[in-house]
Amino acid sequence: MMSNSQISKLFSSISNKENSNENALKESTNKQLNNANTLAITHLKEQLSREVQRREELEGLLEQSQKEMEDLSVSLFTEANEMVAKARQDTEVLKRELDYLRAKEKGRIGKLRSIQTAVRTSIEARKLLSYSNESNYH
């Protein structure tokens, strides 16, 4: 038969083995959890890296689009200003030409009136001469 001390040692030994098995199981579970966590963290880091890269690409495209829009706006306003300046020049040229033609027309109207007056005077003079000649022949 076994003594109490031997029985205690046996229970102690069994208890130590159970604790050892529990610890091994806990350690194995912890390793699996750590591996799963490491994989999840690695996956999240990769996903974050892709998203950061995509955001940087999109920010670059946005900046490029804004620059193009600014360049187009500057170009559009420059072209519009040039068109307005050209229209003003054309209008000024047309005003000068209109003033010249009006002055020329005024001069021609004056000459026409002078000619009309001369013709009337000539007609009246012919009538007078005609009466005068007729009076002399009768």
UniProtKB/Swiss-Prot annotation:
Its main location: cytoplasm. The keyword Coiled coil applies. Residues 1-11 have a biased composition (Polar residues). Induction: Induced during meiosis by the transcription factor mei4. Protein levels rapidly increase during meiosis and then decline. Residues 12-23 have a biased composition (Low complexity). Keywords: Coiled coil, Cytoplasm, Cytoskeleton, Meiosis, Sporulation. One of its GO terms (cellular component) is meiotic spindle pole body. InterPro entries: RAB3IL/RAB3IP/Sec2 (IPR040351), Sec2_N (IPR009449). Residues 16-104 form a coiled coil. GO terms for molecular function: guanyl-nucleotide exchange factor activity. Residues 1-31 are annotated as: Disordered. One of its GO terms (biological process) is ascospore-type prospore membrane formation. Pfam families: Sec2p. It is found in: Cytoplasm, Cytoskeleton, Microtubule organizing center, Spindle pole body. Interacts with spo2. Involved in sporulation. Plays a significant role in modification of the spindle pole body prior to spore formation and is required for initiating forespore membrane formation. PANTHER family: GDP_GTP EXCHANGE FACTOR SEC2 N-TERMINAL DOMAIN-CONTAINING PROTEIN, RABIN3-RELATED. This is Sporulation-specific protein 13. The gene is spo13.
